């Protein structure tokens, strides 16, 4: 959920909810080793805490990450994690609906929330002296949420309108929705984060409360605080607020989900829509995530995606835009931050009249050439430098740091793995890139989607 709960604080880029999870890859976890190391500890009730010092401005970002997302929903209840995210702003017995948000607004801060396949998060960015108040609010709603039908049902309508805006009225989002459903035949990543419309329409107060009581607890969460703070000085306040919330012993320590069978055949999806102005070709490959990959594979996939898909020097751009002039743009992203098997996505915007078959052949040729022929050392060095530079520049955003650590820890990475990501990128070799391309970028592991304009004449209604 986004704009409805945003309040102004200059310089902060709001997180996306559905389309960020559906259409794009979140930033790879990254931090340079020159930054102060995060401080981590765990409370007696199981709450994990990560404190990231950043003393440049007297501002702090608090994020609470719950280890539950759309992939943890009961079949038939898709969209429930995202629906509950909306409802978490409806107040508690101690703090009526709106008081939390009004307090953030009054101090000149910003708040929002986001839902992903694997996690749900809530954050506030406020002046340093308001952190204790934010802790009290957030700890209270961890188990104190009060829901009534009179505010649950209207919020369901808000979610449905969000679905209309982000998916139903966006042909490219609908294509990605269908690609994901085809890519994951068995795993719940095949369900959209926002849910299927016909299931959203049936979600109830009882559904939301049951999900809340099952998953929202300190031993299923990580608190991330980034900003002008000292870990030892704020720990007593964390103990005073979050430390008083009882744990939920029934929550399993590991997530058990149905896994994908070995892919046996390539799949295709075609979506025709009269509203399409720019056709698209998207290909998604089923690949390991940072938590399921063998040693060295995840950073190699990061570099591979950058090599073939980012910028005007990328191999796909050179082949399809410059050489063959089949496309106006190309892109490739690797979604590494996930609990289970993830994807590497290729996107091509064709030139008018370009043949999809020719574009597919060109994509295949780029991958085949990368596998069979030596990767120039200057290309490898360039893309690794780009990735590491992006990590350095991103440190200007305090909230991006909190997001990197929160997302990484929540899917199962250690703080050291996140912090040392640049070193892992530096260590990637050309042979490793060729190995992961050969192993994972094969047609049988892919779904190719075509977005085309529907030129079928509209049917005229029969008159009696």
Predicted regions located by residue number:
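Non-catalytic beta-strand/loop surface segments
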Residues: 28-70, 96-129, 166-220, 244-291, ...
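N-terminal secretory signal peptides that target proteins for export/translocation
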Residues: 1-8
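A common structural junction motif
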Residues: 139-147, 241-249, 364-375
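Short pre-active-site segment immediately N-terminal to the catalytic Zn-binding motif
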Residues: 69-77
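Active-site SXXK
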Residues: 78-92
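Hydrophobic helical h-region of N-terminal Sec-dependent signal peptides
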Residues: 13-19
């Amino acid at each position: 959920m986004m704009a409805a709960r945003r309040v102004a604080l200059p310089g902060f880029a709001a997180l996306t909810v559905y389309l960020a999870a559906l259409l794009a890859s979140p930033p790879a976890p990254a931090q340079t080793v020159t930054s102060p190391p995060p401080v981590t500890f765990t409370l007696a009730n199981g709450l994990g805490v990560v404190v990231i010092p950043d003393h440049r401005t007297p501002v702090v970002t608090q994020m609470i990450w719950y280890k539950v997302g759309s992939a943890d929903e009961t079949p038939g209840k898709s969209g429930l994690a995202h629906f509950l995210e909306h409802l978490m702003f409806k107040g508690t017995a101690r703090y009526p609906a709106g008081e939390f948000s009004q307090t953030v607004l009054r101090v000149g801060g910003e708040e929002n929330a986001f839902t992903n396949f694997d996690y749900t998060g809530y954050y506030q960015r406020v002046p340093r002296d308001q952190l204790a108040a934010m802790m009290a609010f957030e700890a209270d709603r961890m188990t104190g949420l009060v829901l009534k039908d009179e505010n649950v049902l209207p919020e369901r309508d808000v979610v449905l309108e969000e679905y209309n805006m982000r998916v139903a009225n966006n042909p490219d989002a609908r294509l990605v929705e269908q690609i994901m459903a085809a890519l994951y035949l068995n795993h719940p990543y095949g369900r959209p984060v926002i849910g299927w419309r016909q299931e959203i329409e049936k979600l109830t107060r009882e559904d939301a409360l049951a999900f809340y009581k099952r998953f929202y607890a300190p031993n299923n969460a990580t608190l991330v605080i980034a900003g002008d703070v000292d870990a030892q000085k704020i720990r007593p306040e964390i103990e005073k607020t979050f430390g008083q919330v009882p744990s939920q012993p029934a929550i399993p320590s590991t997530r058990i989900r149905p896994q994908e069978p070995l892919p046996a055949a390539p799949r295709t999806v075609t979506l025709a829509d009269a509203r399409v102005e720019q056709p698209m070709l998207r290909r998604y490959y089923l690949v390991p995530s940072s938590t399921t990959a063998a040693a060295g594979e995840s950073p190699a996939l990061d570099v591979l995606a950058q090599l073939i898909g980012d910028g005007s020097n990328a191999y796909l751009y050179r082949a399809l835009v410059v050489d063959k002039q089949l496309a106006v743009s190309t892109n490739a992203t690797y979604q590494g931050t996930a609990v289970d098997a993830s994807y590497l996505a290729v996107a091509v915007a064709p030139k008018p009249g370009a043949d999809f078959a020719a574009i597919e052949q060109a994509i295949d040729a780029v991958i085949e050439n990368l596998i069979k022929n030596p990767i120039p050392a200057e290309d490898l060095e360039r893309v690794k430098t780009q990735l590491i530079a992006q990590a350095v520049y991103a440190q200007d955003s305090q909230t991006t740091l909190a997001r990197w650590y929160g997302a990484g820890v929540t899917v199962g990475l250690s703080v050291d793995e996140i912090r040392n990501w640049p070193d892992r990128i530096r260590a990637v070799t050309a042979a490793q890139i060729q190995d992961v391309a050969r192993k994972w970028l094969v047609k049988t592991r892919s779904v190719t989607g075509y977005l085309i304009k529907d030129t079928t004449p509209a049917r005229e209604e029969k008159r009696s």
